[in-house]
């Protein structure tokens, strides 16, 4: 994989002004973004998140998943902490793409869960790759991470690429009546680390 740094600009948000760093995977043509806030230290643990693109959740306010809620919570947590990063990776639909994601949603509307829908379309449950994170983190100067995630695959990927995960910070937000079954499937079939408290909450 060849990751090329392209440019950096300011990104004003409701939580403060982030810096937006653009990267291109010259082999696949995919474009990725790193958001940074404050001053990042290579010597100290930095609060951060690896976030895969979710057009429906991040931009269209879908309640079928928790992605948009997690992105906003991560940005708010980083701003409140005073520094941090988000790697926004272009891996829509756990790597199957937007149109296939819509096809998977159609199958879910007919009763399949999120894993079954992917498999019925001929895909693995999760096809995301994380080999781009190392060169991006090197560019923004991060070596030690407090990682906001419920996904053990992201923790494993960080460690495999030589990035120290000092702490896993749970990010359990956004549960509602439309996504509760989806979240339970992520917990039971994809191994996401969610507490029973998250499912006992009756605020839907």
From Swiss-Prot:
<feature type="binding site">
    <location>
        <begin position="92"/>
        <end position="94"/>
    </location>
    <ligand>
        <name>GTP</name>
    </ligand>
</feature>
<feature type="active site" description="Proton acceptor">
    <location>
        <position position="126"/>
    </location>
</feature>
<comment type="similarity">
    <text>Belongs to the GTP cyclohydrolase II family.</text>
</comment>
<feature type="binding site">
    <location>
        <position position="67"/>
    </location>
    <ligand>
        <name>Zn(2+)</name>
    </ligand>
</feature>
<feature type="binding site">
    <location>
        <position position="114"/>
    </location>
    <ligand>
        <name>GTP</name>
    </ligand>
</feature>
<keyword id="KW-0479">Metal-binding</keyword>
<protein>
    <recommendedName>
        <fullName>GTP cyclohydrolase-2</fullName>
        <ecNumber>3.5.4.25</ecNumber>
    </recommendedName>
</protein>
<dbReference type="InterPro" id="IPR000926">
    <property type="entry name" value="RibA"/>
</dbReference>
<feature type="binding site">
    <location>
        <position position="70"/>
    </location>
    <ligand>
        <name>GTP</name>
    </ligand>
</feature>
<dbReference type="InterPro" id="IPR036144">
    <property type="entry name" value="RibA-like_sf"/>
</dbReference>
<dbReference type="Pfam" id="PF00925">
    <property type="entry name" value="GTP_cyclohydro2"/>
</dbReference>
<keyword id="KW-0547">Nucleotide-binding</keyword>
<dbReference type="InterPro" id="IPR032677">
    <property type="entry name" value="GTP_cyclohydro_II"/>
</dbReference>
<feature type="binding site">
    <location>
        <position position="154"/>
    </location>
    <ligand>
        <name>GTP</name>
    </ligand>
</feature>
<dbReference type="GO" id="GO:0005525">
    <property type="term" value="F:GTP binding"/>
</dbReference>
<keyword id="KW-0686">Riboflavin biosynthesis</keyword>
<keyword id="KW-0862">Zinc</keyword>
<feature type="active site" description="Nucleophile">
    <location>
        <position position="128"/>
    </location>
</feature>
<feature type="binding site">
    <location>
        <position position="65"/>
    </location>
    <ligand>
        <name>Zn(2+)</name>
    </ligand>
</feature>
<dbReference type="GO" id="GO:0008270">
    <property type="term" value="F:zinc ion binding"/>
</dbReference>
<keyword id="KW-0342">GTP-binding</keyword>
<comment type="function">
    <text>Catalyzes the conversion of GTP to 2,5-diamino-6-ribosylamino-4(3H)-pyrimidinone 5'-phosphate (DARP), formate and pyrophosphate.</text>
</comment>
<comment type="pathway">
    <text>Cofactor biosynthesis; riboflavin biosynthesis; 5-amino-6-(D-ribitylamino)uracil from GTP: step 1/4.</text>
</comment>
<dbReference type="GO" id="GO:0005829">
    <property type="term" value="C:cytosol"/>
</dbReference>
<feature type="binding site">
    <location>
        <position position="149"/>
    </location>
    <ligand>
        <name>GTP</name>
    </ligand>
</feature>
<feature type="binding site">
    <location>
        <position position="54"/>
    </location>
    <ligand>
        <name>Zn(2+)</name>
    </ligand>
</feature>
<dbReference type="GO" id="GO:0009231">
    <property type="term" value="P:riboflavin biosynthetic process"/>
</dbReference>
<keyword id="KW-0378">Hydrolase</keyword>
<dbReference type="GO" id="GO:0003935">
    <property type="term" value="F:GTP cyclohydrolase II activity"/>
</dbReference>
<feature type="binding site">
    <location>
        <begin position="49"/>
        <end position="53"/>
    </location>
    <ligand>
        <name>GTP</name>
    </ligand>
</feature>
């Amino acid at each position: 994989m060849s990751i090329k740094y392209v440019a950096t600009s300011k990104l004003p948000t409701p939580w403060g002004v982030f810096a937006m760093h653009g990267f291109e995977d010259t082999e696949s043509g995919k474009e990725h973004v790193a958001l940074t806030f404050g001053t990042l230290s290579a010597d100290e643990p930095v609060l951060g998140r690896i976030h895969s693109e979710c057009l429906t959740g991040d931009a269209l306010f879908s309640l079928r998943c928790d992605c948009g809620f997690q992105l906003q919570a991560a940005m708010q947590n980083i701003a409140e902490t005073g520094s941090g990063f988000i790697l926004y990776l272009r891996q829509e639909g756990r790597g199957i793409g937007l149109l296939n994601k819509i096809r998977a949603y159609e199958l879910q509307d007919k009763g399949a869960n999120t894993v079954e829908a992917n498999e019925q379309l001929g895909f693995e449950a999760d096809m995301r790759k994380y080999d781009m994170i190392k060169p991006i983190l090197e560019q923004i100067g991060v070596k030690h991470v407090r990682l906001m995630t419920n996904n053990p695959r992201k923790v494993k990927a960080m460690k495999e690429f030589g990035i120290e995960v000092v702490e896993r910070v749970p990010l359990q937000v956004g549960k509602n009546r439309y996504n509760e079954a989806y979240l339970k499937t992520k917990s039971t079939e994809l191994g996401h680390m969610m507490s029973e408290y998250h499912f006992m909450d009756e605020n839907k």
